Amino acid sequence: MERVRDFSPYELKVSVYDGAAEKRTMLMDGHLYMVKFGYDAAPQEEHPSRTSYVNLPVNEYIGSKVFAASGIPTQDVILGDYKGRSVVACRDFMYEMDPNLMLLHFKQLEISMPGGSSRSKARPDWEFVSQVLDEHDALEGIRARARHRFLQMTCVDALIGNFDRHANNWGFIADRRTADILDLAPVYDCGSSLSPSLSREGMRERVEDPQQMREANMAAPYMAMNVGGKRRKFAFFLTSETARPFRAELPELWPRLSEEVTDRIVEQTPGLDDLQRVFYKATLDARRKYVLGPAYRMALKEAETSTATVGNDTLATDIVPGIPFPGLGGNPGLLH
């Protein structure tokens, strides 16, 4: 298991990164890092269980590790302490690349679409996101991969309960001289997940009451995306007809995000106490069962129906021998 790293001896400089949370820049062992701090929020009378964002570094760490386990390239993260404060160091993947390369956020594609400046929002519409993915000429070389990434990223965000995957929180690697998009960027910014503002008392209440754990994860969070003009809960969206292409990714992702996998990630997270370990394991398990599970079972049935339909069509269709027919073969897997 990794240990919590003491970053106190290192000089932290002004942040060169955007975003709301407190952050600084650190050079360590030849690598550049964005250092994110946990922090206390003012108590809210209407939400007494949401009084602290001190868990944000841990949530960034666990969320990033879950993404990495899913097979999606993800930022490297190190949990640490800076002069008594909890922090997470996120390695700047651009720092070690060719200086002629730059990170291009999806937001920049939105506003460069015809009429995009009026349709690009802090919380994007799925219909517009889909149009950008399908039509933007800058994606010509990686269009299929970009759509695949967004669909899978949304599914993993549903597992970790990330409510902040807006258009500035994912993107591409581009040539700054020509603005040509060359590749997908690793996933970054996963801190707004796993109930980052929940107090220890709130954690304890959920751990001690499985029904509350289930209901809390079914009810929240909302996605950082509108669908049909409304912000949707992950659980509602993933079982809707609109989400069919999203849940079609779940049979591939499911074995990579099993209970064994996420439990191991939590066990290997340094610095957690017993309550936190139980809470994070139980939260990921609840979200897998109640948010992803129904959509996964739908995806299996839809795949079976699609295969059966293709099979029936095949009987009545003249097919040139030796040419594979799409949709045949492949075991979608079993629900664990």
For the regions a protein language model found, what residue spans apply to each?
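Conserved ATP-binding subdomain of kinase catalytic cores across diverse folds
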Residues: M1-S117
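A short, terminal or domain-edge coil/loop segment
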Residues: E2, F7-E11, W126-G141, S199-E201, ...
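A broad, structural surface signal
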Residues: Y61-A69, H148-D157, A282, A286-K289, ...
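An exposure/low-complexity boundary signal
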Residues: C90-N100, I160, H166-A167, F172, ...
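ATP-dependent phospho-/nucleotidyl transfer catalytic cores
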Residues: F93-C155, L159, S240, R264-T269
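C-terminal catalytic region of ATP-dependent kinase domains
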Residues: R176-G327, G333-L335
